[in-house]
Design a protein with these regions (language model features):
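Divalent-metal coordination cores built from histidine and acidic residues
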Residues: 49, 53-54, 69-172, 261
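Histidine-rich, glycine-flanked metal-binding segment
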Residues: 1-56, 448
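Acidic, glycine-enriched loop/beta-strand segments at the rims
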Residues: 14-25, 330-332, 396-407, 414-456
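Active-site neighborhoods of metal-dependent hydrolases
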Residues: 121-180, 223-227, 232, 236-402
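Divalent metal-coordination and catalytic microenvironments
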Residues: 11, 26, 31, 51, ...
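Metallo-beta-lactamase
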Residues: 57-64
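Active-site beta-loop-alpha junctions enriched in small/polar residues
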Residues: 64-66, 87, 113-117, 176-178, ...
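C-terminal cap of metal-dependent C-N hydrolases
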Residues: 341-350, 354-356, 361-373, 438-484
Length: 490
């Protein structure tokens, strides 16, 4: 009789690739799933999973919360792999090195960053591979957002190409933060991704409905790039960049897919976005395009919302990198939540958080202490995206079956990255030979608990979370000494 290091016994195993949804034992040795059996297995450690779902660990394609504290909050929401793909990092070697030296609870990976490479060239920025120091600190400076000569574009593309050689998982393109750049530059970056066989991850520029003067409609730009370059284009947080125009945007994606292009999408189940308050599209004179006012915006960690345009201008000048809530849709209004739900239930859409770096109101960041103190704040999506998806879309609204919701949190994101990253093909699955990244949750009680006022309340109902066969969460308790996360590289 084979004895396994660990057996998860008698749980409801959901494997989205094979369609398995049945009571099984799962045997784990050395960080790898060795057996999925309808017969009882013998384990050195056996954990009774009766009445619980045993799922692949959730894979977040879009997290900016890449420190230890952010990982821990996401672990309690069922996540086992967090990837910084939309903003990316430049140089990626520095981002990977920092995570390796400090240790991480969850698996992690980075795309290279078009925006930060652009800042390096146009601002002369000495980049560190850290989102706060590089991108957020310089988000409001106009020099990096301007159109560039062909020579400069070639330099930027060359820098990104070298970063792909250092293991970057693709190219993050924050074109929505530099919305006047030449569309030809975007196509050059997409063409590089196509040559490398890796995806791009785009924060779209303005839709024509929101800015009739945009050089190109943000959704059209993404689908045309897929068609003309052959690149796999991933459309980030299609809910928050499309808002009430989501049907037109998803219609374009459907059409280009039918013609053979690869365009993938993601969404999160919240009505408020969050970004640096200095972002171009939050200029007071542009807010009306999204149906917003200064009062739609609130600074993370501050009481109340911004009262007027003059205050917004002052804040944008003095602290452009400060994180701001942007209340786009009222998620408690069913007719408005329906826009978000359409993005989440679109064919093969991934659930992804857009998790935000934690901020400590006292000033000094404290990413290693646990539990988080009352002065730690973030967007509730950082702590609650997956719990909320399972609560609202599966249990309450019934618009996704449980196996389909699991697929959107696991296999779909694994496959988005997996085309150019073979190690991702061992994730998002509960099969012999796959990584033992596993999430065990109670389908009847799993829920988000974070709110816009209590932003770091972790989800409930995620009973056990394993990364590489090691518990990061056990019996709903985070294990602060567990740092089994490994780098995911192309």
């Amino acid at each position: 009789v084979t004895t396994y290091d660990l057996v998860l016994a008698r749980g409801r195993v959901i494997d989205p690739e094979t369609g398995l949804d049945a009571v099984r034992d799962v045997g784990v040795n050395g960080g790898v799933i060795q057996a999925v059996s309808d017969q009882p297995l013998d384990g050195v450690t056996t954990v009774d999973a009766t009445g619980l779902v045993v799922s692949p660990g959730f894979i977040d394609l879009h997290s900016h919360s890449m420190d230890v504290a952010g990982h821990r909050l996401q672990a309690l929401d069922g996540v086992t792999t967090v990837l910084e793909l939309e903003a990316g990092a430049y140089p990626v070697a520095a981002a990977y090195r920092r995570a390796e030296i400090e240790g991480r609870p969850l698996n992690y990976g980075f795309a290279t960053s078009w925006a930060v490479a652009r800042m390096a060239v146009l601002l002369g920025l000495d980049t560190s591979g850290d989102l706060r120091n590089d991108f957020l600190a310089n988000i409001g400076r106009e020099e990096w957002q301007r159109a560039a000569s062909r020579n400069v574009v070639d330099r930027i593309v060359g820098m990104l190409e070298r970063d792909l050689g250092d293991g970057a998982l693709g190219i993050g393109i924050l074109v929505g933060y530099a919305p006047r750049v030449d569309p030809a530059e975007y196509l050059s970056v997409a063409a590089l991704a196509a040559r490398a066989g890796l995806p791009t991850y785009t924060h779209a520029r303005e839709l024509v409905e929101m800015d009739p003067t945009t050089p190109v409609d943000g959704a059209e730009e993404i689908v045309r790039a897929a068609a003309s370059t052959g690149a796999h284009m991933h459309y980030c947080h299609v809910n928050s960049t499309s808002i009430r125009h989501v049907d037109r945007v998803l219609g374009l994606v459907e059409k280009v897919r039918a013609e053979g292009s690869r365009v993938t999408t993601e969404a999160y189940p919240y009505g408020a976005g969050m970004t640096g308050v200095g972002a171009a599209f939050l200029a007071p004179e542009l807010l009306h395009r999204r149906g917003l006012t200064p009062h739609s915006i609130g600074l993370l960690g501050a009481e109340g919302r911004i009262p007027d345009a003059d205050t917004l201008r002052r804040v944008r000048e003095s602290e452009p990198g400060s994180a701001a809530f942007v209340h786009l849709l009222d998620e408690d209004d069913p007719s408005q939540f329906d826009y978000i739900q359409r993005a989440l239930t679109f064919t093969d859409a991934a659930v992804a958080t857009d998790a935000v770096p934690l901020l400590w109101r006292s000033g000094a960041p404290d990413p290693f202490s646990w539990p988080l103190g009352p002065d730690a704040v973030t967007h509730p999506r950082t702590a609650g995206t997956y719990g909320r998806t399972l609560r609202r879309l599966v249990r309450q609204n019934g618009v996704l079956s449980l196996p389909e919701a699991v697929r959107r949190c696991t296999l779909i994101p694994a496959d988005v990255v997996g085309s150019g990253v073979p190690t991702m093909r061992r994730k998002g699955r509960v099969q012999a030979g796959c990584d033992a990244d596993l999430t065990v949750f109670d389908p009847e009680t799993v829920s988000d608990r974070a709110t816009y006022t209590e932003t770091v309340r972790h989800s409930s109902g995620f009973v056990h979370v394993l990364v590489g066969g090691r518990f990061v969460v056990r019996d709903e308790c985070l294990l602060p000494t567990a740092l089994p996360g490994r780098a995911v590289r192309a």
